[in-house]
Each structure stands twice: as structure tokens, then as C-alpha cells.
Design a protein with these regions (language model features):
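N-terminal cationic-hydrophobic initiation segments that often serve targeting/anchoring roles
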Residues: 31-35, 103-106, 148
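Noncatalytic linker/hinge segments flanking ATPase motor cores
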Residues: 20, 36-38, 85-98, 152-161
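Glycine-rich, flexible loop segments associated with nucleotide phosphate handling
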Residues: 38-43, 85-88, 175-187
């Protein structure tokens, strides 16, 4: 996808895969040539898993359309929700493709590690009606559940920040309110 985190790691060998097709080409090359071209490769890091699924959706739509283009009454899919007959079957096929590729890497002797983005999601407890926030992944829960079920460990990093509002001295001439900015007081 459009992640460039590898730029900040000294000595890392990285292959930018901005399309899912490129991801498949790179991983297939590693799988096919592990012993000859990549004998010391131990792990592939996917930065980020949510971006991988984002670039995978248009790939799956195109693949689905190519596979069915000559069929009578076929209406090309424009989104993943329309692919594979709808009802989340497009997402399920994309999950299958991603998981199969990760399994092939593992069988070739290459582990995988992925990073992802997190977000805060507000929920209401069904019994008490209380609202609460939880930290979760910034991707479809369907995709996350599939990856979570194939992972040995999942960690979520969270930074607890204390914020304060500070006046910066500028006053709005109409409302007479001073302009404020938010500053980080502490992080842990």
C-alpha cells in the first residue's frame, strides 16, 4: 500500500508493494526462490495489514470480473460488496487469498509479521446500557478476525496522553474569546 515505514529502519531490505498484484508477485517470487535467492530471509513484514486489505479489494473485484466476463447475464462488480455474488463473499475470497499466501510463505520457511493502525471504537453495553471505548484495529472486523485467528500473538500499542488547553493570547474581536491550542502535557 502507501506505507513507507521501512525508510526509518537502518539496513532493512524493503520492497514497496503499492498494488495487491505486486504483493502477490513479490511473495510468489520469495516462495518459489527461497532456497536460491533468499536463503537468509527469515521474515516478511507487512506494513500495514489494513493497507494490504485495502489494496486487495480492487484486485479481487478485477479478478472476479475477469473470471466471469463471458457468462450470460453477468454484471461486472464495481465494489467488493458486489463481487462473488455479494453477501460478504468478496471479502471472504480476499481473506482466503491473503491467508493462503501467508501459509505458502510459512511453508517456504519465511515467517510473517504485520503492523496495523488502531482506532478507538465506542460501544454500548447490551445489558447495562453503559457506553465504553475500546481500542481496536482500523480495518474491517471481518478481516481482523480472520488474521487474528491465524496469528500467534497480537499486540496493540496505546499512548496515554494528558492534554491541556492553553490560551495563545489572540482574542476574537467579535466574540472576545481568546484563541486556545491543545498541548500535550505528558505521555506514557
Amino acid at each position: 500500500g502507501s506505507e513507507w515505514g521501512s525508510e526509518y529502519i537502518n539496513g532493512v531490505v524493503a520492497e514497496q508493494t503499492e498494488t495487491f498484484k505486486k504483493f502477490m508477485e513479490v511473495t510468489n517470487d520469495i516462495i518459489k526462490n527461497k532456497d536460491t535467492e533468499y536463503p537468509n530471509l527469515k521474515v516478511v513484514i507487512i506494513d500495514t495489514i489494513d493497507s494490504l486489505f485495502e489494496i486487495g479489494e480492487p484486485y479481487l473485484v478485477k479478478l472476479y470480473n475477469q473470471e466471469h466476463i463471458g457468462e450470460k447475464g453477468f454484471i461486472p462488480a464495481k465494489t467488493i460488496n458486489a463481487a462473488e455474488g455479494g453477501f460478504m463473499h468478496g471479502q471472504d475470497r480476499l481473506i482466503e487469498i491473503v491467508i493462503n499466501q501467508l501459509v505458502k510463505l510459512r511453508k517456504a520457511g519465511v515467517g510473517f509479521w504485520y503492523t496495523g493502525h488502531v482506532k478507538r471504537r465506542s460501544n454500548d453495553d447490551a445489558f447495562s446500557g453503559e457506553s465504553y471505548d475500546m481500542i481496536t484495529t482500523n480495518m474491517s472486523q471481518r478481516y481482523f478476525a480472520a488474521i487474528r485467528n491465524k496469528s500467534h500473538a497480537i499486540g496493540i500499542a496505546y499512548i496515554d496522553r494528558t492534554l491541556t488547553q492553553q490560551e495563545i493570547g489572540k482574542e476574537n474581536p467579535i466574540t472576545k474569546e481568546k484563541k486556545t491550542i491543545t498541548r500535550i502535557v505528558s505521555e506514557s
